[in-house]
Amino acid sequence: MKKILTSLAVVTTLASTLSADFARVEMGAGVWGQTPSGYATRTDGDGFLNLDGTYRSSENNSQEMYAWVLIKHPIPIVPNLRLEYVSVYDEGLTTGDVNGIGVTDSPTSLDTKQYDIIPYYNILDNTFWTTIDLGLDIKIIQSHTIVDAVDTTGLGGIAVDTTIYDSTDTTVVPLLYARARVQVPMTGFGAETDVKVISDGTNTLYDIRAKVDYTFDIFPIVQPALEVGYRVQQLTVDDGDTQVDLNYAGLYAGLMLRF
């Protein structure tokens, strides 16, 4: 009987280990301290901001929320799933012609919400403490742009701080996705990086993160964790009429739960 109980205990432990390895849910949320920089120029009076002129970032730091969920399952062929959300914010000045109104150094805000739907496959799944994922990121970008007038000079009697442009747009962009993670054996420490990128050589969008995290193995079902990292987003466009060079970078930190 003792041997049977011992064998059952071993089998149960192995089954739990395999289940944890092949079906897993992780989630996290925190704050990204972004420092934006760059500019956007439009020269044909159409498209970005309906602008014939230039927007320049004021490079003011902003604390924005992010969240993510990772769902891994044991079903072959069907990809795993990662969902992400992040808010990106910038304030700057616009000079040029906006909606037919001449402006100089008009306060402008770019408020962007990004939603990432990422189906992916495990190339390595904690093999020798190493994980590699490859997939496709479907990035949904919802941008809200506001341009305010600063005075009435040349504006046809428009009052101070009147909004002269207010627009919301949604864009869907596919990107390649890759993630690599290394777990330090016999500890709760891990390090990982992920890259989302699309480029045709002239126009480029990428989103790169690198982080370390620590998992507290104190509960049998759910394990809390902390993560700290650095994130960079870069958008570069040069198609003749439009030139864009916008960058968001900074440290982020958050809480995680592993199931």
Language model features: what each stretch is:
Residues Q223-F259:
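Outer-membrane beta-barrel translocator/channel fold
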Residues S19-S87:
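Short glycine/proline- and aromatic-enriched beta-strand/turn motifs that initiate or cap beta-hairpins
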Residues S19-A23, P74-P79, L124-T131, V184-F189, ...:
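Short loop/turn motifs that connect adjacent beta-strands in outer-membrane beta-barrel proteins
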Residues M1-R24:
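Cleavable N-terminal export/targeting peptides
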Residues A23, N61-M65, D111-Y115, T130, ...:
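Residues that define the transmembrane beta-barrel architecture of outer-membrane proteins
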Residues A29, A67-H73, I117-Y121, L136-I138, ...:
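Residues on the lipid-exposed face of transmembrane beta-strands in outer-membrane beta-barrel proteins
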Residues S37-S57, Y89-L110, Q142-D169, G201, ...:
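Flexible, solvent-exposed loop segments that connect beta-strands
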Residues V31-T35, Y85-E91, I123, I138-H144, ...:
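Transmembrane beta-strands of outer-membrane beta-barrel pores
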